[in-house]
Amino acid sequence: MEKFRVHGPFTLSGTVDISGAKNAALPILFAAILAEEPVILTNVPNLKDVETTVKILRKLGVVVERAENNAVHIDASKIDHYVAPYELVKTMRASIWALAPLVARFHQGQVSLPGGCTIGARPVDMHIAGLEKMGATITLDEGYVKAEVNGRLTGARILMDKVSVGATLSVMMAATLAKGTTTIENAAREPEIVDTAIFLNKMGAKITGAGTDTITIEGVERLGGCEHHIVPDRIETGTFLVAAAISGGRITCRGTKADTLDAVIEKLREAGMQVDVTENSITLDSLGMRPKAVNIRTMPHPGFPTDMQAQFTLLNVVANGTSKITETIFENRFMHIPELIRMGAKAEIEGNTAICHGVENLSGAEVMATDLRASISLVLAGCIANGQTIVDRIYHIDRGYEHIEDKLQKLGARIERFNAPFEE
């Protein structure tokens, strides 16, 4: 099993090129199922989840070719299979996005329920409710969600029970080929939804309102090919800005968009950091200062993103002062805190709130990653801790951060990936 070995502490400074956003690349790759002509995507990050998505597409009969400079060529004109199988879906919850484009274009589709996810637990039920309102018949059989419709889906007014990025994307994709007009109310507003809508419109869809809480989709009969550049990853950007803030460094993130990160930049400035913005870059200069503690409350976009919560937990455990972090989006998203406590952090969890008491130094330790964002916070903790930190289960990081050790090494990190023997 692969692990990271980090020898801290050190200052992280320099320039980093930001990759394409995983959270835009995945739905856009699945949305390419809707196209009857070839599609070319650029700025597609080289990640485990992208690799899994490509495997699912190929299983359906889509021709997918990787090209230079993170380009992907997709031809979905000869799809001959309508089932996304368990052996691929089990590793990635985002696989549910295959269902809506399949049923919209081919009037049928089957997707294995993502591993450990029953209908009603996560918002998989909202994806299904949206398709049902558009006329699909949904059955659950032997662990597979099966969707069928006679003829085309029908446009509908769909009011989301709660703000859900995944369900908003599913309904938006399905509605592009539906008969009539669909409105999504209480829609998620994330930049990745906007990027997916731009991609679909390039293929001939008629979508307005993406980025607001009401999206309108006028159905069309077919979608064609296009070229599209994936939006930069705002979460990767925020992660590297935090890396500079906690290590006393100065980092410039190139090829990114500040207007997708307003809530994060505001909190970094509140923490005492100097943040300068251009059209395509963000620079954070810590001025060699220890950050001030900042209170965080995660919210749907444009509020503070849940995917930056773990990184700001780390910032707060080494900040000057005491802070509260309230997680309103996901349950069980404080699993990094016990690991940070092993490194000398002082924090306690009360329900959906963590209270952090800043300490001046962390100590290296053996820690275990539990999910994608928690894992990167542990790696960054190792960068500022005294001594050696070993981070286990780093496959989580490879799901969402492209070339992470290379990028950190260029900023001054002493980090290496190594293979450890499997231990019972």
Swiss-Prot record:
Protein name, per record: UDP-N-acetylglucosamine 1-carboxyvinyltransferase
Transmembrane helix as UniProt keyword: no
UniProt binding sites for UDP-N-acetyl-alpha-D-glucosamine: R93, K162, V163, S164, V165, D307, I329
Keywords noted in UniProt: Cell cycle, Cell division, Cell shape, Cell wall biogenesis/degradation, Cytoplasm, Peptidoglycan synthesis, Pyruvate, Transferase
Active site, per annotation: C117 (proton donor)
Subcellular location: Cytoplasm
InterPro entries xrefs: Enolpyruvate_Tfrase_dom (IPR001986), Enolpyruvate_Tfrase_sf (IPR036968), MurA_subfamily (IPR050068), RNA3'P_cycl/enolpyr_Trfase_a/b (IPR013792), UDP_GlcNAc_COvinyl_MurA (IPR005750)
One of the GO biological process terms: peptidoglycan biosynthetic process
